[in-house]
C-alpha cells in the first residue's frame, strides 16, 4: 500500500494527551502499541526528545525504515507549567535531531547555517525577537520582572534549557 497521507505514529501517552497536538505536527497523530506491528499507513514515528522512553519507539521505527521526528517544548512553551495543565503555545518538531543535542545536526541548526535559504525569514525573526524582549516573554512566562539594581557587582549569566 502506498503511503500518501502524513500519519505520525506515537507510542507515548504523554505526547498523545498534549492539547491540540495535531495543530503542531506535520501529519495526523495516531496512537500505537509497542505490541503490535506498525500500520503501513504510518509515515514516521514521533518521540519526545531523547527521553529514555523514546528508545524503544526509535528502535521500532528504525527496524522498519521509518524516520523519527523528535518533539520538545517550544522556546515559548506556555502561560504556565505543562504539569499544571497549561497547554503548549509551541512545540519544536525536528526531523533531523533536536536542538540541544550537538552530536547530530538539528533542523534549527541547519536553518541557522543556511544563510541564503533563511534570508526570507530574517525580518520575521527580527520582529519576533523584538516582541519577546519588548513583552518580557519567557519559556513559561511566570517569572517576575527583573530590574537590575543601580549598583550591581559583576555577574555570570547561566543559561539552561
Feature locations, PLM:
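Catalytic-core helical/loop segments in enzymes performing group transfer/polymerization on anionic/lipid-linked
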Residues: 1-161
Amino acid at each position: 500500500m502506498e503511503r500518501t497521507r502524513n500519519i505520525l505514529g506515537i507510542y507515548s501517552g504523554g505526547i498523545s494527551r498534549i492539547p491540540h497536538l495535531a495543530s503542531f505536527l506535520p501529519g495526523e497523530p495516531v496512537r500505537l502499541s509497542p505490541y503490535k506491528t506498525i500500520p503501513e499507513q504510518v509515515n514516521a514515528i514521533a518521540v519526545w526528545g531523547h527521553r529514555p522512553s523514546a528508545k524503544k519507539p526509535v528502535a521500532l521505527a528504525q527496524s522498519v525504515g521509518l524516520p523519527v521526528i523528535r518533539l520538545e517544548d517550544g522556546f515559548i512553551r506556555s502561560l504556565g507549567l505543562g504539569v499544571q495543565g497549561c497547554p503548549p503555545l509551541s512545540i519544536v518538531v525536528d526531523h533531523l535531531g533536536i536542538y540541544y543535542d550537538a552530536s547530530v545536526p538539528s533542523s534549527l541548526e541547519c536553518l541557522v547555517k543556511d544563510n541564503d535559504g533563511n534570508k526570507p525569514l530574517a525580518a520575521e525573526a527580527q520582529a519576533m525577537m523584538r516582541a519577546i524582549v519588548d513583552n518580557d516573554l519567557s519559556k513559561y512566562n511566570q517569572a517576575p520582572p527583573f530590574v537590575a539594581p543601580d549598583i550591581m557587582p559583576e555577574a555570570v549569566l547561566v543559561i539552561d534549557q
